[in-house]
C-alpha cells in the first residue's frame, strides 16, 4: 500500500523521468496576482507562461501544489469536501500535447499505480474525436469512453476571452454494487459509483469576446490530480479522514476531546471539521494570511471560528487550536518545511485569534439561542444576523449554518442591507470626500468628461486651458473673487489624491485672475478637480491658464512617499516576508503605513527598521520609474496590492540598482534616496487584530521631531534633578512611589466603605416580601462598590441590593440578586437597564449581578428612588 508521501514522490519522479522539471509548490497567496483570492490549482503559478508573457526554463514541468477553495466550506465535515488540498500536475508549455499527455497518464495509473484497467472509465468533450482515438490507442474500449458537454469537459477561458480547450478525465469505477445499481450507469451519473481521478486539460484555443475560437500556435497541457482523492483510492479507505494524511490530525482531535471517531455521525462530523479547518488555517497563516474582515483574511477567520464552534460541540471549552495546529505541523512539515520555519508565528496567531473569538462566543451563542426561540415565520432577521456578526464576531455563514440545523433560514438580503448601512457610515466618517463643489449631480453634468492629462512627473508648471468650472450650483462659465469652485484643466501638473498620496496644492493663473488650489481630486472618469478659491480677478471657461504646483510641498510629499516604499522593504526584512501592506497615507508632514503583523514591534525591531531605511538614504540610491505591461511587471516580481485594479500598462517605481524596492505606483517620488535626508519613526501602534500602524517623518520634520524629543528630555531631566541618562530610572522610582500611595488610599477607602456598609445593613427593608437595600454611596469607585455589594449580599442572605455612586463625574449603578429570588423571577440585569435609562445611559447583565451607567449624574437619586417600582 502506498503512503501519501510515497504517492507524491512517485508521481513527481515519474514525470521527471519523462523530462519534466520538478517545481516546488507556490504559496497559497498567488504571487503578485491581485485577481485571485487564493491559489486554486496547480497551473496558477504558471499563468505567465500560458499567457505568453514569460518563458519557462523547461517547457515540461511537474508539481504538487497546495491549493485552497472556498466554495464548499459549509460542506466540510462530510466524507469528501475539503478547503485545502494538494494537486498533482504535469504541465507542457507549447511542447507536448494530447498524445503524450494521454499516453503518460494511462501508463502512470495502470503501470505505476497498478490500478486495473477494467476499473477505469474516460470522459471527453463532445466533439473531441482526436482524444477518443488516442484513448483507444491505449486500449480503452469505446464503451468506457463517454462524451460530455462543456459543463463537465471544457475548460476556460478565465473571463470573457483567452486561452481555453477541451479536457478529458479518468474515472475509477467502484462497481455496480455501489451507487444507483443501474446497468447503464456511467461517469455522467452522480450516484457515487464513479470517482474522478485525473483531469487532463488540452489548452488549444484562444477565444475572443464574441465566442469565436482560433487554434493557438503552440497548444499546451495542464493536468490536475487530487492527492487526497488518490490516497483514498490507493489505501482502500472510505474517506480522506481515514487515510494517513488526516489520521494523525483526527487522532489529536479525539485525544483533546475525549471522543472516539466512528461512533456516531454528529461526533464524526465535528471531528472532521476541527481537523480539516485546523490544517487549512495552519497553512494559510504560514503563507502569510492574517485574520481580517474581508478577502482571504475573512476566509481564515471564518474557518478558525467554525472550528472553534464545532470544538465546543465536542466539549472543548478551553483553547485547543494551537494543539491541533501542532499536530498539522508535525504531520506536514516534512513536505512543507515553511510550516516548521514559521511555527512560532503560526501558533501565536492562532492563539490570539482563538482567544479573541472565545471572549464573545458564549454570549453570542446565548443570544443566538434566544433569537431562535423568538423567531417566527422560520426566518432569522438580517438585523439579528448582523448583530451576531458585528458584536459577537459570528460570520453570517456560520449563523446560517446553525440556523439551518434548527430548521430556520436567515434573511441574507436584510443582512447585506445592514452591512451597507455600516459601510455608508464608515465612508461618511472618512476624511476624503467631495465637497459641495463636486457633488454627484455636478459631476454628472460636467461639460468636459475627457481624462485630464497629467504632466506632473516631469513638470511643476504647465500652460493649460480651463475646460470646465464646477460650483455648488453646478457648472458655470466664470467665477470671481471669493468664489469657491473646482476647475477642470485639459493638462495639469497637479497630482490628484490617489493611492494614499494627498493631492497637490498651488495656483492656476489666467490673464484675468488667480485661483488658489487647496486640493486636487481624482474622479472615477479620470478627470482631475482642482478645488479652491478665487484670490483675485475672474477666471473663465476656455481661457488659457498657467498651472503651478506648490513645489516645496510636493518635495516633502515625495520624500515621504519614497520612504514609505523603502519602509515596506525594511519591515519584510526585519519582521518576515509575511508582512503585507494594508494601507498608507502620504502627506507633506508625515507618512502612515498600515501592515499585517501579529504583535507590537520591539524597540530593537523598530531600531533595525530605522537603520535599514536610513542606510538606503545615505547610499543615495537612484529612484526611477518605467512603464511596462502589467503581466511583465508581475513576472519580474514587482509588488502589487491585492484588490487593486490595474490597467494593461502599469508604472513601476524602483529604488536602487539592483532594486531594493519595486512596486506598482503612480505617485510622485524623489529622484535619489539621499533627498529624503532622514527617516524617524514617531509611533507604532495597533489598529486592529493582526494589524499594526507606523507613523514616521522625514527630512525637516524628522529633524524637528528629534529636536522636540531632546527638548522634552532636557525639561524632564531638570524636573527630576537628574541627567538624561538617569531620568528613566528616577521616573520609574517615582512611579513606584505613586503606586504605593495609591494602594494605601484604596485600602483606606475599603476600610471606610466597610464601615459604611455595616451601617447600610440597618437600612434594609422588607418590601413586598423581599429584603430590599437601596442606597447612594459617596467617594467610592466601581471596584469598591462591587466589594461593598458582595459584603451586603453575604450578610443579607436573601435580598435585592441596589447601590449607586458618582464616579468620574458620571452616575454608576450596581445590582445584586440572591439565588432564591432569581428563582422567583427577579433579574439584576433588567433592574440596572431601567436605572441606566433614567440617567441617560445603558447597562445590563446577568440575573445575579449587573452594572451600568449614565450620562446625567443629577438623575442618580431619581433613579434610585424608582427601584421600588421595579420590584
From Swiss-Prot:
Note describing how the cofactor binds: Binds 1 zinc ion per subunit.
Keywords: Aminoacyl-tRNA synthetase, ATP-binding, Cytoplasm, Ligase, Metal-binding, Nucleotide-binding, Protein biosynthesis, RNA-binding, tRNA-binding, Zinc
GO molecular function terms listed in the Swiss-Prot or TrEMBL record: alanine-tRNA ligase activity; aminoacyl-tRNA deacylase activity; ATP binding; tRNA binding; zinc ion binding
Catalytic reaction list: tRNA(Ala) + L-alanine + ATP = L-alanyl-tRNA(Ala) + AMP + diphosphate
GO terms classed as biological process: alanyl-tRNA aminoacylation
Enzyme Commission no: 6.1.1.7
A GO cellular component annotation in the UniProt record: cytosol
Superkingdom to which the source organism belongs: Bacteria
PROSITE patterns per UniProt: AA_TRNA_LIGASE_II_ALA (PS50860)
Domain notes: Consists of three domains; the N-terminal catalytic domain, the editing domain and the C-terminal C-Ala domain. The editing domain removes incorrectly charged amino acids, while the C-Ala domain, along with tRNA(Ala), serves as a bridge to cooperatively bring together the editing and aminoacylation centers thus stimulating deacylation of misacylated tRNAs.
PANTHER family in UniProt: ALANINE--TRNA LIGASE, CYTOPLASMIC (PTHR11777:SF9), ALANYL-TRNA SYNTHETASE (PTHR11777)
Role of this protein: Catalyzes the attachment of alanine to tRNA(Ala) in a two-step reaction: alanine is first activated by ATP to form Ala-AMP and then transferred to the acceptor end of tRNA(Ala). Also edits incorrectly charged Ser-tRNA(Ala) and Gly-tRNA(Ala) via its editing domain.
Descriptive protein name: Alanine--tRNA ligase
Annotated organism of origin: Dehalococcoides mccartyi (strain CBDB1)
Protein's gene: alaS
Amino acid at each position: 500500500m502506498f503512503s501519501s508521501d510515497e504517492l507524491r514522490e512517485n508521481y513527481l519522479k515519474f514525470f521527471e523521468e519523462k523530462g519534466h522539471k520538478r517545481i516546488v509548490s507556490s504559496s497559497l497567496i498567488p504571487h503578485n496576482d491581485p485577481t485571485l483570492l487564493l491559489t486554486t490549482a496547480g497551473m496558477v503559478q504558471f499563468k505567465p507562461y500560458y499567457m505568453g508573457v514569460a518563458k519557462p526554463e523547461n517547457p515540461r514541468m511537474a508539481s504538487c501544489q497546495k491549493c485552497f477553495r472556498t466554495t464548499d466550506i459549509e460542506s466540510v465535515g462530510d466524507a469528501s469536501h475539503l478547503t485545502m488540498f494538494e494537486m498533482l500536475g504535469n504541465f507542457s508549455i507549447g511542447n507536448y500535447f494530447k498524445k503524450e499527455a494521454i499516453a503518460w497518464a494511462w501508463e502512470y495509473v495502470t503501470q505505476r499505480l497498478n490500478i486495473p484497467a477494467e476499473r477505469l472509465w474516460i470522459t471527453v468533450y463532445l466533439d473531441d474525436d482526436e482524444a477518443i482515438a488516442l484513448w483507444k490507442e491505449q486500449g480503452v474500449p469505446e464503451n468506457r469512453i463517454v462524451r460530455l458537454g462543456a459543463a463537465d469537459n471544457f475548460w476556460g477561458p478565465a473571463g470573457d476571452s483567452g486561452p481555453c480547450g477541451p479536457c478529458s478525465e479518468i474515472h475509477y469505477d467502484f462497481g455496480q454494487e455501489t451507487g444507483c445499481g443501474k446497468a447503464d450507469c456511467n461517469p455522467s451519473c452522480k450516484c457515487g459509483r464513479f470517482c474522478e481521478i485525473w483531469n487532463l486539460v488540452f489548452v488549444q484555443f484562444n477565444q475572443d469576446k464574441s465566442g469565436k475560437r482560433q487554434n493557438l500556435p503552440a497548444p499546451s497541457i495542464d493536468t490536475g490530480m487530487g492527492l487526497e482523492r488518490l490516497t483514498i483510492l490507493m489505501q482502500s479507505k472510505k474517506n480522506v479522514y481515514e487515510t494517513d494524511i488526516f489520521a494523525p490530525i483526527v487522532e489529536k482531535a479525539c485525544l483533546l476531546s475525549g471522543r472516539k471517531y466512528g461512533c456516531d455521525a454528529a461526533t464524526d462530523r465535528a471531528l472532521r471539521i476541527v481537523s480539516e479547518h485546523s490544517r487549512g488555517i495552519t497553512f494559510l497563516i504560514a503563507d502569510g494570511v492574517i485574520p481580517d474582515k474581508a478577502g482571504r483574511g475573512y476566509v481564515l477567520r471564518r474557518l478558525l471560528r467554525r472550528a472553534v464552534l464545532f470544538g465546543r460541540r465536542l466539549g472543548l471549552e478551553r483553547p485547543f487550536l494551537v494543539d491541533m495546529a501542532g499536530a498539522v505541523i508535525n504531520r506536514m512539515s516534512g513536505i512543507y518545511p515553511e510550516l516548521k520555519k514559521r511555527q512560532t508565528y503560526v501558533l501565536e496567531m492562532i492563539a490570539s485569534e482563538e482567544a479573541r473569538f472565545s471572549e464573545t462566543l458564549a454570549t453570542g451563542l446565548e443570544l443566538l439561542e434566544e433569537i431562535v426561540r423568538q423567531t417566527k415565520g422560520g426566518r432569522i432577521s438580517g438585523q439579528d444576523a448582523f448583530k451576531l456578526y458585528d458584536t459577537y464576531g459570528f460570520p453570517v455563514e456560520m449563523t446560517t449554518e446553525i440556523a439551518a440545523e434548527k430548521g430556520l433560514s436567515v434573511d441574507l438580503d436584510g443582512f447585506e442591507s445592514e452591512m451597507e448601512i455600516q459601510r455608508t457610515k464608515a465612508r461618511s466618517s472618512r476624511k476624503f470626500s467631495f465637497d459641495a463643489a463636486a457633488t454627484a449631480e455636478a459631476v454628472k453634468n460636467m461639460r468636459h468628461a475627457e481624462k485630464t492629462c497629467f504632466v506632473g512627473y516631469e513638470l511643476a508648471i504647465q500652460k493649460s486651458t480651463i475646460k470646465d468650472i464646477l460650483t455648488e450650483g453646478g457648472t458655470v462659465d466664470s467665477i470671481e473673487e471669493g468664489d469657491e469652485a473646482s476647475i477642470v484643466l485639459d493638462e495639469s501638473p497637479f497630482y490628484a489624491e490617489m493611492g494614499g498620496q494627498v493631492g497637490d496644492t498651488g495656483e492656476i493663473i489666467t490673464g484675468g485672475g488667480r485661483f488658489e488650489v487647496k486640493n486636487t481630486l481624482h474622479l472615477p472618469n479620470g478627470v482631475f478637480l482642482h478645488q479652491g478659491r478665487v484670490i483675485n480677478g475672474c477666471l473663465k471657461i476656455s481661457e488659457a491658464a498657467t498651472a503651478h504646483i506648490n513645489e516645496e510641498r510636493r518635495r516633502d510629499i515625495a520624500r515621504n512617499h519614497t520612504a514609505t516604499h523603502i519602509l515596506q522593504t525594511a519591515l519584510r526584512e526585519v519582521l518576515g516576508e509575511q508582512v503585507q501592506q494594508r494601507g498608507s497615507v502620504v502627506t507633506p508632514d508625515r507618512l502612515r503605513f498600515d501592515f499585517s503583523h501579529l504583535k507590537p514591534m520591539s524597540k530593537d525591531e523598530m531600531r533595525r527598521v530605522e537603520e535599514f531605511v536610513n542606510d538606503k538614504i545615505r547610499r543615495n540610491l537612484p529612484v526611477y520609474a518605467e512603464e511596462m505591461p502589467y503581466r511583465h511587471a508581475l513576472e519580474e516580481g514587482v509588488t502589487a496590492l491585492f484588490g487593486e485594479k490595474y490597467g494593461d500598462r502599469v508604472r513601476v517605481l524602483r529604488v536602487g540598482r539592483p532594486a531594493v524596492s519595486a512596486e506598482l505606483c503612480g505617485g510622485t517620488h524623489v529622484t535619489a534616496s539621499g533627498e529624503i535626508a532622514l527617516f524617524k519613526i514617531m509611533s507604532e501602534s495597533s489598529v486592529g487584530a493582526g494589524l499594526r500602524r507606523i507613523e514616521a517623518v522625514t527630512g525637516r520634520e524628522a529633524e524637528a521631531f528629534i529636536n522636540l524629543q531632546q527638548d522634552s528630555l532636557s525639561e524632564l531631566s531638570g524636573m527630576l534633578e537628574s541627567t538624561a541618562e538617569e531620568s528613566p530610572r528616577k521616573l520609574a522610582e517615582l512611579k513606584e512611589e505613586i503606586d504605593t500611595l495609591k494602594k494605601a488610599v484604596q485600602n483606606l477607602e475599603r476600610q471606610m466603605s466597610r464601615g459604611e456598609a455595616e451601617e447600610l445593613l440597618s437600612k434594609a427593608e422588607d418590601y413586598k416580601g423581599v429584603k430590599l437595600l437601596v442606597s447612594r454611596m459617596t467617594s467610592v469607585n466601581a471596584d469598591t462598590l462591587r466589594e461593598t455589594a458582595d459584603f451586603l449580599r453575604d450578610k443579607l442572605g436573601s435580598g435585592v441590593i441596589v447601590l449607586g455612586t458618582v464616579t468620574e463625574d458620571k452616575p454608576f449603578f450596581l445590582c445584586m440578586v440572591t439565588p432564591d429570588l432569581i428563582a422567583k423571577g427577579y433579574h439584576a440585569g433588567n433592574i440596572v437597564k431601567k436605572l441606566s435609562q433614567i440617567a441617560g445611559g445603558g447597562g445590563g447583565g446577568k440575573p445575579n449581578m449587573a452594572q451600568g451607567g449614565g450620562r446625567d449624574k443629577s438623575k442618580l437619586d431619581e433613579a434610585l428612588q424608582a427601584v421600588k417600582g421595579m420590584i
